A protein has these predicted regions:
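Short beta-strand edge/turn micro-motifs at domain boundaries
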Residues: 158-180
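Sec-dependent bacterial lipoprotein signal peptides
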Residues: 1-15
Length: 180
């Protein structure tokens, strides 16, 4: 019986060596790098998780905020009086896909994420200080870009987040707050 076990282990070891022989590996790292960046949804998810800091429970508006390009870039504030729709007061026109929701869940690494369809109702129902975030579509150019994340308190507070592909995942850093 032990010979059979030894034979199975030997086959598994040889199969493992053969499967990694052609992988693109760095001499100092064991994980292969991915030549092309991850999906835009992963970039947006990284920005949301970054903006949430370490809050254990976060509400995320279920869909992208539709805002003018200048607002998404952080060049001007959301002008509610001037006719911009308040992404913290009305539902998005299109909900996230299941793969976008999965990317967001993965980026939050086990923290509780509640997807909210009606942000105005959610703000009324959630306890004071609860975090509710909404994001615009990422503005990406290759391996870098930005995502405007809005924290609803109840009015939108803009935070422009820079995202960069590091060969394995999108990494997020604050670029600063958008104009208010």
């Amino acid at each position: 019986m032990w010979r059979l076990t030894a034979a199975v282990v030997a086959v598994l070891v040889l199969a493992g060596c053969a499967s990694t022989a052609g992988a693109d590996r760095d001499a100092h790292r064991s994980a292969p790098t991915t030549p092309s960046p991850g999906t835009p949804a992963q970039a947006m998810a990284a920005a949301l998780a970054f903006a949430a800091h370490s809050d254990p429970e976060v509400g995320v508006v279920d869909g992208y905020a539709a805002l003018p390009l200048a607002v998404q870039r952080g060049e001007q504030p959301i002008d509610l009086a001037g006719g911009h729709a308040n992404p913290c007061a009305r539902p998005p026109t299109q909900r996230f896909t299941s793969s976008e929701r999965a990317a967001i869940q993965a980026a939050f690494g086990g923290r509780t994420v509640a997807f909210v369809q009606d942000p105005a109702a959610a703000l009324r129902q959630r306890p004071p200080g609860s975090l509710l975030l909404v994001a615009t579509r990422p503005l990406l150019a290759g391996r870098r870009g930005t995502v405007m994340v809005l924290s609803c308190m109840p009015g939108p507070q803009q935070v422009l987040v820079t995202v960069q592909w590091d060969g394995h995942a999108w990494q997020a850093t604050a670029t600063g707050t958008g104009k208010r």
